[in-house]
């Protein structure tokens, strides 16, 4: 990376600010990440991997800018329950589960709109 490189930092509000890098801090952070990745502690390895991802270049066309996110992303994920056997995860099963999930979502939206006295079929 060039000596005059800069960083783009996004704060919790998504506001960008440019800051000049501190080379000694970067080297120190890199060695800490390497130690964490090489450690036997699974949690340390996960933290190191997460930090490494957050420091990826924001744009591949300009390697002098790096995007660093201050806030970790916590998106709600609904896992699909484990099936009794791997063979049960065929296309019809997956399709049925998706349809059921969409049906539940549609019903929740319908109820939250204040239409509690109507049947679900009238929503279709």
UniProtKB/Swiss-Prot annotation:
Region of interest (Disordered), ranges: 1-65
Composition bias, Polar residues: 37-47
Domain of life: Viruses
Record's protein name: Uncharacterized protein G2
Native source species: Microplitis demolitor bracovirus (isolate Webb)
């Amino acid at each position: 990376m060039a000596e005059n490189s800069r960083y783009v930092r996004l704060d919790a509000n998504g506001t960008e600010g440019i800051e000049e890098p501190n080379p000694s801090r970067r080297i120190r952070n890199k060695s800490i990440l390497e130690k964490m990745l090489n450690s036997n502690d699974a949690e340390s390895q996960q933290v190191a991997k997460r930090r490494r991802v957050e420091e990826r270049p924001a744009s591949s066309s300009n390697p002098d800018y790096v995007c660093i996110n201050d806030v970790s992303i916590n998106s709600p994920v609904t896992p699909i329950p484990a099936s009794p056997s791997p063979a049960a995860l065929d296309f019809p099963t997956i399709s049925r589960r998706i349809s059921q999930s969409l049906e539940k979502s549609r019903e929740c939206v319908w109820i939250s709109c204040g239409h509690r006295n109507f049947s679900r079929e009238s929503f279709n």
